[in-house]
Amino acid sequence: SRLRAANPHPTTELEYSTPFELLVAVVLSAQSTDKGVNLATRRLFPVARTPEAIVALGEAGLADFIKTIGLYRSKARHLIAACRMLAELHGSQVPADRAALEALPGVGRKTANVILNTAFGQPTMAVDTHIFRVANRTGLAPGKTVLEVERKLLKTIPAEFRVDAHHWLILHGRYVCQARKPKCGECIIADLCEYKGKTWPATEEMNKRSNGSTASDGATSHSTKSASGQVAAYPPPSPRTGGKTKRRATPAKTD
């Protein structure tokens, strides 16, 4: 896969060090940016990084740490309730089970998919706005609903790519196949894409591929040149900083 060649170890840009911290970050990320969530969790986690510690803060106390994030009051309420359930039913551990995850307040199918994939390495697909757009534009898995796209992606994508496909598609949608101004001239799969609204630099890139001047699928370069001649690197693997994995999960609405 070209996406794997460009980014062998894709990750989310949300910062976390345990499955519980990831759960908190993903719940907070709904209708919020990853940058905003990371700023909040950098304040929160040094003070409270377990379900018991979060509950001890209370809704008002937790809200103070996350008030820079949209819908922070409802998120604080959901997180307190979810933490109580984790402590009472799961020994304060995040379950690696879809039904148990979706039973937690504030956790729906998409959030559960992120946790199962990112924390536990399961081949799930959390379809957010980026994945939905890429799947429909490229023709990889066209669908009218999130669930339809999710099911088609899992059916279409070969097994060896499924665990990482979630992050590849999100990163591609966020940095290249953007909603308003897709960077088709920098796209490493432009010649495979069925999108009729390709921006003109894609034509040059597609011609290069058809003439054999671009690497094959399995050995695609990590960068491409835009129309201006500047090299645009495809999003590299996110660095690890301070013991925390910097990852970016796609925040859409809380499921």
Label for each model-derived stretch:
Residues 1-207, 235-249:
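Catalytic cores of DNA base-excision repair glycosylases
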Residues 208-252:
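Intrinsically disordered, low-complexity terminal tails and inter-domain linkers enriched
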